[in-house]
Amino acid sequence: MNFDNAHEGIKKLIIAQYLGLFAAAAGLLSIFLTMSMSSALNASAGLKAALGAGGGALVFMLATGGLGIASIVLTIIGLVKAKSDEMNFQTALTFTIAGLGCTIASNLFGSVPVLPGLFNLGSTVCSLFSTIFIVRAIINLSETMGEMGMVKSGQLLCKIIFIAKAAAVGISILTNFFPFLYSISILNFIISTTSVAIEIVVYLLFLRDLIAGRDMLG
């Protein structure tokens, strides 16, 4: 069978995942540089050292935001293209748009108590289901094409991603509803780096599945 739309859509999803991976890496670097700035100030290492670390952190923060936006846009474009070949891509598109809406709402209502936390949590949950439904779409296409090895690896990936994203949801709850944890610098660092590390692992696993799906359909 011919799944040209899914093939083209998945190619765009792969580019989106690369951008998302670079965004996560930039976010991780910004965390380390922010901690370096804080350490420089606390240790009286000098204003120049602190400003250098702070400037670097700002650059990587901006890179994280820009790459993240580009990744979401390409994801939506890819899913719009692929959805005509497999209905799970349509479901993933719905969750992706809902997650984007939650992110925008979180920024719009940033000064309102509780609401930003709820919207951030909603965005994380939407990301979980969007990823799962994309993997499910590739599983269904693999089954149609008789690629049972891809079916089994996709089913395993669904479980791994669900566990990893569930951990991300737990971290989202901690950071959004127990903000006092951020007043403890070491906990702030551990929570932030763990969250980004989980995100990077999911990106890599998901990217591997997308590439396999593209090659199968190509």
Give the predicted meaning of each segment:
Residues 1-33, 70-107, 122-171, 196-218:
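Membrane-interface extramembranous regions at the lipid-water interface
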Residues 23-71, 102-127, 165-199:
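Membrane-helix interface segments in multi-pass membrane proteins
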